[in-house]
Amino acid sequence: MEQQQQQQQLRNLRDFLLVYNRMTELCFQRCVPSLHHRALDAEEEACLHSCAGKLIHSNHRLMAAYVQLMPALVQRRIADYEAASAVPGVAAEQPGVSPSGS
């Protein structure tokens, strides 16, 4: 059980780092047009702050929607699984009826 928790934590960390790296790359490409200076100028810094803030806000909204929809998705998957499991059982319970219908 502990190993599963560690694997889940590693997956969560990997997912976080992928999102972070993608956000960093996207904002850097948008906001830093040249690398002629060692330091960011005020305009670049403001752009990066705005870009990162927008992406973080969007990510929070997506996660909130995901958390809200997740119980319904799980219930639907359970119902689909139960329905799919019940279909082969019905044909097996009826003697003389083949599953292919012939």
UniProtKB/Swiss-Prot annotation:
Complexes and interactors? Component of the TIM22 complex, which core is composed of TIMM22, associated with TIMM10 (TIMM10A and/or TIMM10B), TIMM9, AGK and TIMM29.
| CC terms in the record's Gene Ontology section | mitochondrial intermembrane space protein transporter complex; TIM22 mitochondrial import inner membrane insertion complex
- Known InterPro entries for this protein? Mito_inner_translocase_sub, Tim10-like, Tim10-like_dom_sf
- Which PANTHER family is this protein grouped with? MITOCHONDRIAL IMPORT INNER MEMBRANE TRANSLOCASE SUBUNIT TIM9B
The keyword GTP-binding belongs to this UniProt entry's keyword annotation: no
Subcellular locations according to the entry: Mitochondrion inner membrane
Q: Name one GO molecular function term.
A: metal ion binding
Q: Could you tell me the gene encoding this protein?
A: TIMM10B
Report the record's disulfide bonds: 27-51, 31-47
Q: Which function does this protein serve?
A: Component of the TIM22 complex, a complex that mediates the import and insertion of multi-pass transmembrane proteins into the mitochondrial inner membrane. The TIM22 complex forms a twin-pore translocase that uses the membrane potential as the external driving force. In the TIM22 complex, it may act as a docking point for the soluble 70 kDa complex that guides the target proteins in transit through the aqueous mitochondrial intermembrane space.
- Where can the motif Twin CX3C motif be found? 27-51
Q: What is this protein called?
A: Mitochondrial import inner membrane translocase subunit Tim10 B
User: Which keywords does UniProt give here?
Assistant: Disulfide bond, Membrane, Metal-binding, Mitochondrion, Mitochondrion inner membrane, Protein transport, Translocation, Transport, Zinc
State the organism of origin.
Pongo abelii (Sumatran orangutan)
Q: How does it sit in the membrane?
A: Peripheral membrane protein
Domain remark in the UniProt entry = The twin CX3C motif contains 4 conserved Cys residues that form 2 disulfide bonds in the mitochondrial intermembrane space. However, during the transit of TIMM10B from cytoplasm into mitochondrion, the Cys residues probably coordinate zinc, thereby preventing folding and allowing its transfer across mitochondrial outer membrane.
List, in alphabetical order, the GO biological process terms annotated in this UniProt record.
protein transport
Sorted alphabetically, which SUPFAM superfamilies does this protein's record hold?
Tim10-like
